[in-house]
């Protein structure tokens, strides 16, 4: 036998060494993330039910908003069956958004297949041009999950179209133009001009040319606006594109929503959606636009603590700015503002294929509410649904508490009303929704002095015009059109400010007072928020021009909070007795799960957990919660899921991808969204998923937020109701729905630790409302803390938010988890101050991170750790993982989870053994070969 050469020995030894190193490193990584890898997913035979698919389609159908319908261009005539789908967005339709809110639509229908399935003939030459021909190189571009990459519209230039493609249009009856925009996590839409010379929310030159091509070839063009953010749509009024006879908006359609489009075109579905955002002619005209983007605290060296953002607009978000400024012009309080050139489509706007006549408006006072009734009659030929929107006007006194001219306080959607039939609708307006938050003087909720109005309107502008008509105003005073005073009523006059009636929580009875003085930028610098007392003088500019030299106090506050300096809990902690490493197990979770949170048996149960078990429950909450056999706590799986459970994590299957939240809200059909929550919950059980990271309840503060698709609306009341109803559905199935991102996470740029400043009135009346609805009316028992700061302090460590409002005012009984905490960049989400404030769990999958072993003998931390463990266990006890009562499906059957376990440990051991044996065997072979004497 030939003796191996020295070179061979070196090579074999090196390979063995490398394999051993890889094995060791891989094993360390695997065990560091064992909490993430120890997962159980549904089996691959999941199939959505017929009812679920129908609901997904119907949500998209009811969420579609008809913007224009000149000469009844829609629905299409029966002989208009040959359609040309024009624009690259026709083959690159927006189904959702990117990031954690993305959904798996791999099996979703295309626009072409959906239309063909409904009997339409689609121009194949044009489709192939976009899909596989020269047009395929043109697609929308958006940044990746990390926020890297450009936003590009990338419509196909006219120069790329061949003669054959353009000639093919002559064979079609109607042109269907699709204009799309998308967004996603980690990046906001660009607020500066693109290389094309237009803003992202404007149509660019290539799109204009594409529209011109469509209008040159067709007498009837239908535009589909497939965008989750409100675009500038002035082309709908441009004579150049006069053949665009109809247009409707429809955002991310989800898995089955595409099937709603042919039904809208043929009239099977009569559009009944209403806009959830104001559509301005100039998307940069909103006061929030002046404070969007990347701003730096130039003298801060704190990790993830050198960025800031000031909500200078105060309460004047969306229509609350545009409509209020309009009223002040009509009342003669200001000038220099033209509503008709500012707003194209007001909040709440939407057309129908039929005409609805309203009458018999009436307001009846009840004990805690007003009941508003309206008779709705269908005067047209198409059956359809209508939306009745109720708005309030609260009095404003110059220099006093800010109040918008109108704000939504209730709404309802009719059933299907047949031609010539009518329906009387009732809307309850709670008296508590007529309050304002006075953060300067009374520091609580007040009923302001003066006249209070209610108005029924087809949109916010219509409702305001009705109030103005009741005040005696008309077009001669500058109104855009005369209102109808018969749909407005002055419901009461408040003689003096009432700062008592609503100064205590209706849920807990605790006093309500300021919690966010430190979030107001005036805590550090003098600043004036936008006020209707002086629109021009207080209109926001970019705070500190984007570069802020912070005070020493603020720099200190950006650092980790020293919990030992706080004495709030001293009395409770002194009375607390920590039972370490208890050996007896008197109770198991099923023994106490029906008991109220304050029952002492819960404390007895938690005291049976060891310190290590409690801290693992807190530290390792990424996509799963740990199992604790000692108390009968099962392991649970959590998934991203604002719009449905996605199978993007280490394996697993996908379930129904629902339309984007912005589409859900556009239905203005709260019971429908509650039903969606029920189906979503049944999906979760079928998938073996207990916790869902969603829904999102932040606000569309600006048209440019990248994640607007994942949130409901610019309006606080609509967000409140949609979040509440979706949560009711999810909770009815025992799903742990983590309402997110609490709070002030209304911008993606610099979300890692950015210091967000706002006044307390805006925080409570605007930015907290969606979360309040999810918790107070929806029963949410889990929430996700945002990555940003409230003021100088990370949200999860802000006690005012985490405990004083969330628990002491809203009665929240559950736990708060952080956003992503599995990488060192997230270590600013300090666990010690977070536990003190009321954050309970870290979304972490790495066993070596967030160690708490050093605090085992620290009584203060023992208390906070035990409290958080209780919050977590209590919430999980109220899920389908523990309580089988949640598993009864809508059809009466019992849902069973079919598990598929990924045996990664066994596989890792086998691979390790093979590598070890190979390495040892190779080395031994070389060694023996060298030692052998030549034959």
Locations of regions flagged by a protein language model:
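Terminal connector regions
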Residues: 431-503
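Glycoside hydrolase catalytic-domain context in secreted enzymes
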Residues: 1-438, 446-456, 460, 508-935
